[in-house]
Amino acid sequence: MFRSFVKAAKGIYIHHELFLAEKKNPGVSVNVYKEYVFYRIKEINFPVIVKDTLGAGSIGVEIMNSYEEVESFLNSDQNNSDIMVEELIQGEQFGTEIHGVEGRYSVLPPIAFSVTKEGITDPLSSVKFGPVTDPSYHFEKVQEELLNMAQSLKFEGTVQVDLVYRAGEWYIIEINPRWSGMTTTTAAMEGRNPLSIFVDSILGTDKNYSMKRNLKYALNFKMKARSQEDLIRLYGNPHVDYIMQLETSVAGMEKINYCEVVIST
């Protein structure tokens, strides 16, 4: 699907129950699925990203630098759910969303993400800005491929896509067919309420949000949790579209409170 222009990071989805089949079923003497998983992992370039399939926004993501490190993790008690092992593509981090229903899709221009020194997005401190309009990225070709994908798979509502741009090439990192952590930002770019994305998908809209001329610039940033008085004062700014005070629980960490703000102009 993406071979003509957009590449995809090498990776493997590991089914937890199949990976541990010999431990739960005494009748299994040789776990060929586990052997296949390790064979595939050896073919991936390191470092890799290891993450479970239940989290969101890069929470719980680990970077591992060798095959031995991944093997040790998968054979340990830390491996307690389905896992993705994926090549870490170092480069500029972007995201986009697809909005609409069959026959009425908009593929938005990219939003740039800030990254950590490890080269990944930190969901608790990231900054997002878009749309990115530099023509040298040739993102219109990516939009065309994502539009074909949406039409083929008949997506409905919102679809979030993580991308990396490196050495003149685009890579698909992840596709999430749901409301995402950047949906409020894309809605601000479009100048509408996030829920309107779904209403307009059903009723139709005259605007094609794939076009930069139909979008505003939007910025999403995070800061420490604020008092109710501060939130009310902040929301009084005419450029502030959304404020979300959130409490996030991460396994092995204390609860984190932060405030997320989306502004547009």
Model segments located where?
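ATP-dependent carboxylate/phosphate-activation module, predominantly the ATP-grasp catalytic core
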Residues: 87-154, 176-202, 220
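A glycine-centered beta-loop-beta connector
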Residues: 103-104, 165-169
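Peripheral (often C-terminal) accessory segments that flank ATP-dependent C-N-forming ligase machineries
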Residues: 37-40, 199-265
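N-terminal glycine-rich "phosphate-gripper" loop used for MgATP/nucleotide binding
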Residues: 1
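Pre-DFG segment of protein kinase catalytic domains
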Residues: 172-174
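Conserved hydrophobic "DFG−1" position in protein kinase catalytic cores
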Residues: 63, 98-100, 163-165
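A short glycine-rich, hydrophobically flanked beta-strand micro-motif that places a catalytic Asp/Glu
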Residues: 155-167
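Active-site nucleotide/adenylate-binding loops and adjacent lid/helix of ATP-dependent enzymes
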Residues: 5-90, 102, 129-148
